């Protein structure tokens, strides 16, 4: 059993979680067509639908097992968010405001009542309008990414200065590509760098482990996976 498999199995004791692969899923291939604005959706991004975490392919995990473990931990945060808020509410909040575009379909009723043509205005929500809930959920998810990076680097034996430098660089990349960039459709261009700077302080001081049980569970699962793999 690989370290990744041991980690996923241990996480399964606390969360209903499955691992799938985009290159083997027709649904993911269809979704990839809809995500035209994110060219790396099928090859570089991991997506959670329900309780299934879809990786691009099996080689993605084999080539960077520790990276895949970090990503799975990130997606567990989204699963926990969904369990807390309920699937329907979580999905609406995460996709808002772009999900409002669906009401443009009411235009099809214009042949019954002409004013339905005004529903074409809902297509404006396809624009990269800031998404406050998506931003909130992804800050929580990427905080887990930084937390796992810190945990793994400490376990490997890197010194504090190196870890702080790497976490800071990672936070800058995450903000630029995923919050300010097209990865999540320019979801939030303001102040995320400052939020991550504070999160890194909380991670390094140990505060963050005491504020959310998800971190404790993920940490235990990772350490259990490392121990099982070394045996």
Region spans (language model):
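Acidic helix-start/capping segments at beta-turn-to-alpha-helix junctions
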Residues: 25-26, 94-97
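Coil-to-alpha-helix initiation sites in intrinsically disordered, low-complexity, charged segments
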Residues: 25-26, 85-86, 184, 213
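Short pre-active-site segment immediately N-terminal to the catalytic Zn-binding motif
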Residues: 45-72, 87
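Catalytic Zn2+-binding segment of zinc metalloproteases
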Residues: 75-95
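Auxiliary, metal-adjacent structural segments of Zn-dependent hydrolase domains
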Residues: 1-57
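Metalloprotease/metallohydrolase-associated module, dominated by Zn2+-dependent proteases
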Residues: 4-8, 97-231
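Histidine-centered active-site/metal-ligand motif
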Residues: 74, 78, 135-138
